[in-house]
Amino acid sequence: MKKRYLITLLISIALLSLTGCQSVEKWFKNAKEEWLGLEMTVRTYDENSQLIDQMSGKSLSISRNEEFDSVDAEGNSKEDSSVLKITLGKYEIDHVGSSLIAEEKGLKDVFSQYQKTADVEENSHAVPVLNRMISAFKNEFTGKKKVILIRSQNGTPLAAYAGDRVSLDKSDAPKTSELLIDGKRLVIYRCDYTIYDRELLE
């Protein structure tokens, strides 16, 4: 009985690791960011997409600064702080307001490749509810070939990223999105963005 349980457990672990499950990969990425930090570059931009500042490091982590959370009548945190706490090595930076993009080493801004205005027309018939279900499944398990076009808060083009296995995830900080692009983390704060299936733009 114990042997059968052990074999089942080992097969399950092997299957999970072989499928490249995005959810599992996100969990490991989050754990690595929390305990070791990620090798990342963080850039902030003004409303016209002009670079304000840039910071890079081998041990970088971004989270919501809980000190700025508001509380309800019972004293419970609403977890609504818009202030980001950036840990860069042994230093801390607080950021709020301007657009921010943090890219893990290995990601490449492909803005010049996709800087034209997207004009998409698709005339095939489909079942929207089924498409959403399939897309949600792929987001959790395999990711999809996507292009992310990012704009500043006033709509000025800022950056573009593309990947074969892209999945979108929520962040604990308001106005912040986290993406996993081919195993690398991308954090987008206070930016407009559109995520396209890559085939639509190629």
Identify the residue ranges that each predicted region occupies.
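Bacterial N-terminal signal peptides that target proteins for export
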Residues: 1-7
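Bacterial signal peptide processing site
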Residues: 22-24
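Post-signal-peptide N-terminal segment of Sec-exported extracytoplasmic proteins
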Residues: 41-75
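A short beta-strand micro-motif
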Residues: 36-49, 144-154
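Short, low-complexity, disordered segments immediately C-terminal to signal peptides
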Residues: 26-36
